[in-house]
Swiss-Prot record:
UniProt keywords, alphabetically: Cell membrane, GTP-binding, Hydrolase, Lipoprotein, Membrane, Methylation, Nucleotide-binding, Prenylation
Naturally occurring in which organism (per UniProt): Mus musculus (Mouse)
Chain's gene name: Rasl10b
Membership in a protein family: Belongs to the small GTPase superfamily. Ras family.
Annotated compartments: Cell membrane
Effector region, short sequence motif: residues: 33-42
Modified residues (Cysteine methyl ester): 200
Residue intervals passing through the bilayer: none
Tissue expression notes: Expressed in heart and brain. In the brain, expression restricted to neurons of the cortex, hippocampus and cerebellum. Sparse expression in the brainstem and almost absent in the hypothalamic region. In the heart, expressed in cardiomyocytes. Not detected in interstitial tissue or vascular cells.
Name of this protein: Ras-like protein family member 10B
Domain of life from the UniProt record: Eukaryota
Length: 203
């Protein structure tokens, strides 16, 4: 049986969210930053641990605020489909404090607009541009502790440029969505050693 998951990728301008998606899908990276101005949809099929998953990856341009209801969601073409996804990937640049503040704001708005009684939608926070480690503005431990312990979200650092931890990110994404859909499976994420335990490939 093939599972279909819709995933929204959000982040401030220039954080490399589109670069992450393209590195995952096409194994390519461009040094030229082309701002995302419209919503982009990618439809890859992914095999993980022998199971096929159809992904609908929605790459959104930066939004000023998360839509509070369906009416607001469909009034803005850039936000359509944002409230009905199975998981959110929120990307920030580890060298840009403002981009982390953006992620913090969007995450809070997602929680505030969530329909009461619905199942919790997984959120994974992603720190991109790990290859620019020397320019980091917030210590990794501080961010990791806040995201995992306080926010109860998954956390991954990656480098879209060097394809570092990109596969790990989407492997954990599939695991988190699967956990959210199966109540008998413990939903806590375990990122260390994930690639040794799971096999993930794109068709």
């Amino acid at each position: 049986m093939v599972s279909t998951y819709r995933v929204a990728v959000l982040g401030a301008r220039g954080v490399g969210k589109s670069a992450i998606v393209r590195q995952f899908l096409y194994n390519e990276f461009s040094e030229v930053c082309v701002p995302t101005t419209t919503r982009r949809l990618y439809l890859p099929a992914v095999v993980m641990n022998g199971h096929v998953h159809d992904l609908q990856i929605l790459d959104f341009p930066p939004i000023s605020a998360f839509p509070v209801n369906t009416l607001q969601e469909w009034a803005d073409a850039c936000c359509r489909g944002l409230r009905s996804v199975h998981a959110y990937i929120l990307v920030y640049d580890i060298c840009c404090f403002d981009s982390f503040e953006y992620v913090k704001t969007i995450r809070q708005q997602i929680l505030e607009t969530r329909v009461i009684g619905t199942s919790e939608t997984p959120i994974i926070i992603v720190g991109n541009k790990r290859d620019l480690q020397r320019g980091r503005v917030i210590p990794r431990w501080n961010v990791s502790h806040l995201v995992r312990k306080t926010w109860k979200c998954g956390y991954v650092e990656c480098s879209a440029k060097y394809n570092w931890h990109i596969l790990l990110l989407f492997s954990e994404l599939l695991k988190s969505v699967g956990c959210a859909r199966c109540k008998h499976v413990h939903a806590a994420l375990r990122f260390q050693g994930a690639l040794r335990r799971n096999r993930c490939a794109i068709m």
